[in-house]
Swiss-Prot record:
Job description of the protein: Hydrolyzes ribosome-free peptidyl-tRNAs (with 1 or more amino acids incorporated), which drop off the ribosome during protein synthesis, or as a result of ribosome stalling. Catalyzes the release of premature peptidyl moieties from peptidyl-tRNA molecules trapped in stalled 50S ribosomal subunits, and thus maintains levels of free tRNAs and 50S ribosomes.
Molecular function in Gene Ontology: peptidyl-tRNA hydrolase activity; tRNA binding
InterPro entries assigned to the protein according to its UniProt record, in alphabetical order: Pept_tRNA_hydro, Pept_tRNA_hydro_CS, Pept_tRNA_hydro_sf
UniProt keyword list: Cytoplasm, Hydrolase, RNA-binding, tRNA-binding
Residues of the site described as Discriminates between blocked and unblocked aminoacyl-tRNA: N9
Reaction(s) this enzyme catalyzes, per UniProt: an N-acyl-L-alpha-aminoacyl-tRNA + H2O = an N-acyl-L-amino acid + a tRNA + H(+)
Any GO CC annotation of this UniProt entry: cytoplasm
Gene: pth
GO biological process: protein quality control for misfolded or incompletely synthesized proteins; rescue of stalled ribosome
Pfam families tied to this protein: Pept_tRNA_hydro
Residues annotated as site: Stabilizes the basic form of H active site to accept a proton: D91
EC numbers for this chain: 3.1.1.29
EC class of the enzyme, as a word: hydrolase
Identification of the protein by name: Peptidyl-tRNA hydrolase
Amino acid sequence: MWLIAGLGNPGSQYRNNRHNIGFMAVDAVYQSFSFSPWSKKFQAEISNGFINNEKVFLIKPQTFMNLSGQAIGEALRFYKLDLKNLIIIYDELDLSPGRVRIKIGGGNNGHNGIKSIDAHCGTDYCRIRIGIGHPGSKELVHQHVLGNFTKFDQEWLSPLLDALAKNIALLIKGDKSLFMNEVSQTIKNKNLL
């Protein structure tokens, strides 16, 4: 069993924000496979289905970014899942827009959603970091992450989310390298970045 969590903020005013790319990615997975309708549980929206015969729960915490760990921690405990069966998808300031990196464990790099998950769950889980770029100065970070994706961003955003969703089964099978290769190749082949 797996839990795939996308980080973001609830509410229509945040829907297209850079900070909500985790929600967008989980929505892309939801649309790519057969999942149950979204329901409310664990202070989150949650859905379940199967990817490669593995039971998977998708979760979008509705606690706002800084408290994401509360919802994810509740779900992990309820389903008795280990951190090795948790995948978190979120925005990363220190990666160029559209770049993707994956790692197990590590620090939070100042990301408040990750800080919350680390505090409530521990640190040894899979992280898919999607680059949103840095605005250049610390004073502009808040405005940048809560700003909407630009028209230029839309050119890489949809294909990237589609590639993540279509290849997530590789990650569930434990093939991180092939997952990264497939996602990177999709972006490269489309000359998006």
